[in-house]
């Protein structure tokens, strides 16, 4: 499984659409096996989506994301976990323990999880 997290100054980037760096983590048996970082220099959302899809990302954990970009990513088969904020390593550790939605990492004002297949 491959997850990705947009990062900024050691934290989850506040807005996926404008993020310039993406941390990509490979998981085997719910444990990290490798990681690498890429720069997202594509400004066009469809190109940005194509780039993320080309990385083989299964799940993307992010802060805010526009509805059009979320729909593009969902249509590409990528599960989106939006509305998350906090230090990157803490968020990843909590995700790997399966308790991300029950943690204190939800962005202020976020109305609830909108995951793959969501229409909101």
Tell me the role of every PLM-derived stretch.
Residues 61-62, 80:
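Conserved SAM-binding loop
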Residues 58:
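Short acidic/polar active-site loop segments enriched in Thr and Asp
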Residues 1-47, 51-55, 74-75, 80-120:
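Non-catalytic interface/targeting segments
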Residues 69:
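Conserved short alpha-helix immediately C-terminal to the canonical SAM/SAH-binding motif I
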